[in-house]
UniProtKB/Swiss-Prot annotation:
UniProt subcellular location: Cytoplasm
Provenance organism: Rickettsia massiliae (strain Mtu5)
Pathway(s) annotated for this protein in UniProt: Lipid metabolism; fatty acid biosynthesis
HAMAP family, A to Z: FabH
Record CDD domains: KAS_III (cd00830)
Protein name: Beta-ketoacyl-[acyl-carrier-protein] synthase III
EC numbers, comma separated: 2.3.1.180
Gene Ontology MF annotations: 3-oxoacyl-[acyl-carrier-protein] synthase activity; beta-ketoacyl-acyl-carrier-protein synthase III activity
Amino acid sequence: MTCKIIGCGGYLPSKIVSNDELAKFVDTNDAWIRTRTGITQRHIAGDTEYTSHLALESAEKAIADAGISVNDIDLIITCTTTPDNSFPSVASKLQGYLGLTNIPSFDLQAVCAGFVYGLQVANSLISSGKYKTILLIGAEKMTSLLDWNDRTTCVLFGDGAGSVILQRSRDDSGLIDSNIFSSGADYEILYTNGGVSMNGISGKIVMQGQKLFRHAIEKMQQSIKDLLHANQFSVSDIDYFIPHQANIRIINKLAELLNIEEHKVVKTVEKHANCSAASIPLALSTLKASGKIKKGDILLFSAIGAGLTWGSAFIRW
């Protein structure tokens, strides 16, 4: 028994900040950002627009796309590292917004790898037979964690949310396989310099960019190779590669090393920037809206995030 995606939806805040606009208050310029990241703009949530609001917008689109009633949902998992509050969870608040009662809801925190982690967790819960319809969300207000004086990090991130509706598959479609990993010894490569039990503040993002690039290439590539080998797949079997949208150089290098053809690689980082756990479901929603995905297509997701956390998943559409 495995789960399948029956609907998806994405949401980006209406405010768009281009590289040129960013350069007005940050020591940077459009050429510097484009060359190093491939990003031209990012969406930024308003002061009173929280992660739960972004999650709600994407969830409603996914529910409509799936053609189900909101009351069909029997579990909510929100993957986020930027909750509205220390507690309760974003998932709990979202449950209230949707008018649902007496169903479980919880947040999952694996940063940029959150959606892949969440997919494996959701699949296990559906496979148990205990849950029939799961709302899985990646939602982030990453700009709330940015130091706008640090041009090495503030240019990279944006806000947004992506949701999928998961149900048990009754044919050969759905999650084929996935793997997830972590390495706590490497946490100082990417972290926030604050936290509730540390100093009572959320802190700002601190990143060792060159080290993170090397780890991303090494770990995502190995994760994908392991999945290919375990399922007796070849790279040519992949119809679409949807990697975490962190940086165009990481995406391009991975595709090159794995020999994945350019037209199969989904890239949204240019317009979305890095939306952390939301980046893969947002990219999936963009691809689905294009009408390109066909039944039976093999989709490959792969991500790496702070922790370090990483993993990959194969889906048959």
